[in-house]
Amino acid sequence: MTNNVSEGHREKQSYANTRTTGKEQYYTNSDVVDLCIEKAKEHIDLSQRFILEPAGGTGEFVNGFLRHGIDAPRILSFDIEPKHAMVMEGDFLETKLQSENFVCITNPPFGRASSLAKKFFNHASQYCEYICFLVPRSWRKWSVMNSLNMNFHLISDTEMPKNCFYTPCVTEPKKDVLNTVFQIWK
């Protein structure tokens, strides 16, 4: 044994990152969607706004917007694999929009170290006056905040319930819990 590492574990492959990555498809529970929309309404008059949902998935947020009185023509939603009639197929990160006055409300795909969520935020910042994201608590760190468009500032940060998400392939809830916050940026 050398350096506290046995012979069998010295191979490069044994230290490889074995975390699986995929399409980051974790969908938001409808009760959590309602909490997010209510929180957004405390800071933003959504009654006449155009809403951008760039990670539409199963349409949980789209359904929430409709429940909260937002007319369907004012909702724009994308996903690479849409599972709702009002969610258009498309990669938001490759999308160019005409308006700069959207309100973005979403549960973005996080990615490793929030890499995808940061990309979603920075792309949305080109088109939105407000960005409202359901994200891991790590977004409270300066290292995350400093990687976001500096023209935006945090106006609200709310702790969310422990079990915010479900996956379409799992019939039982996941045992590991992700601590999340709902942040509103302007």
Model-derived features: positions:
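Class I S-adenosyl-L-methionine-dependent methyltransferase catalytic core
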Residues: 1-186
